[in-house]
Amino acid sequence: MAGSATVEKRLDFGLLGPLQMTIDGTPVPSGTPKQRAVLAMLVINRNRPVGVDALITALWEEWPPSGARASIHSYVSNLRKLLGGAGIDPRVVLAAAPPGYRLSIPDNTCDLGRFVAEKTAGVHAAAAGRFEQASRHLSAALREWRGPVLDDLRDFQFVEPFATALVEDKVLAHTAKAEAEIACGRASAVIAELEALTFEHPYREPLWTQLITAYYLSDRQSDALGAYRRVKTTLADDLGIDPGPTLRALNERILRQQPLDAKKSAKTTAAGTVTVLDQRTMASGQQAVAYLHDIASGRGYPLQAAATRIGRLHDNDIVLDSANVSRHHAVIVDTGTNYVINDLRSSNGVHVQHERIRSAVTLNDGDHIRICDHEFTFQISAGTHGGT
């Protein structure tokens, strides 16, 4: 359990930037790249067992050396020595937990855990109409980011899908913060940030919605209309699609010079996000469990790890025995607030809600997923799942 690691010294871990381990605020060098990759996997999956086989796959993918298992044990032993040398009981913090090891730490001793907590608090505050409080929480969440996720370990393939999913979560936090700031009457203050974000993420329509709203509420109607034309052209030229109904309706209101109710809009958006967050924790207070329900067989595949890989090879968490499925086809990442699916450059793609995904997509309870001939329903439910 997370509360089992009661120590006098302050142990802290960072994933939202280069991997970081500090004790009482002092950075602790954590060894070779492979040893740091083991630590990263343990922090990503904190308070959950990580199998030795999963660690081997993370380090060597399909080509582990003959001594891979012994190397994993050696890396863990070295990490324990680092902890012990700093006065922390390594057998409590980094314990054997079949089929591997578990890093037991409070969630608030990891930057990702703090990001999730602050983002969740901010969204709940916005849904209740407390926009100043929402802005403070969301700003605190974004301050946890020091740079690209695990930037020093990008050579390891497990990092990319995890980082991509967290960037999705970060963009959502930026969007929610901008909406809260606009609801507080500070539309002009967020324009520069939103201009930079829409340049970096040109297909994220919610960011464009906030930028266009901020322009309009700052008496810059021509800029608002120009921004709509830009996103419409970008979506058409690059993706072959039109803006969604929210953006189209916003543009129509601006053309007619109608007033915008920023507070009502912010509460509505946040309330929808709260519904998604609350799916994770049922009324009983038990942590929700996510599954992929195989429509053909009725089998339920639990999504228990921080990242669940799907593909043809047997080193995947969910193995799909089909020639059309790529060796490593897709991954579903639990970011702490959302489940995000990402196509791992597969040959035949991943379809969510009957559309092929072009980037990471946040899953909602009940979503239909198709991977070649295999069809699933994404489900979040409390307790055990009878189809496993």
Curated annotation (Swiss-Prot):
Residues 2-105 bind DNA. One of its GO terms (molecular function) is GTPase activity. SMART domains: BTAD (SM01043), FHA (SM00240), Trans_reg_C (SM00862). SUPFAM superfamilies: C-terminal effector domain of the bipartite response regulators, SMAD/FHA domain, TPR-like. One of its GO terms (biological process) is phosphorelay signal transduction system. Residues 308-357 form the FHA domain. Changing residue 312 to A: Abolished phosphorylation. It comes from the Bacteria. GO terms for cellular component: peptidoglycan-based cell wall; plasma membrane. PROSITE patterns: FHA_DOMAIN (PS50006), OMPR_PHOB (PS51755). InterPro entries: AfsR-DnrI-RedD_regulator (IPR051677), BTAD (IPR005158), FHA_dom (IPR000253), OmpR/PhoB-type_DNA-bd (IPR001867), Sig_transdc_resp-reg_C-effctor (IPR016032), SMAD_FHA_dom_sf (IPR008984), TPR-like_helical_dom_sf (IPR011990), WH-like_DNA-bd_sf (IPR036388). Phosphorylated on threonine residue(s) by PknH, PknA and PknB. Phosphorylation enhances the DNA-binding activity of EmbR. Dephosphorylated by PstP. Keywords: DNA-binding, Phosphoprotein, Transcription, Transcription regulation, Two-component regulatory system. Positively regulates the transcription of the embCAB operon. Exhibits ATPase and GTPase activities. Belongs to the AfsR/DnrI/RedD regulatory family. Interacts with RNA polymerase. Co-immunoprecipitates with DarG in the presence and absence of darT. Contains a N-terminal winged-helix DNA-binding domain and a regulatory C-terminal forkhead-associated (FHA) domain, which mediates binding to a Thr-phosphorylated site in the cognate kinase. This is Transcriptional regulatory protein EmbR. It comes from Mycobacterium tuberculosis (strain ATCC 25618 / H37Rv).
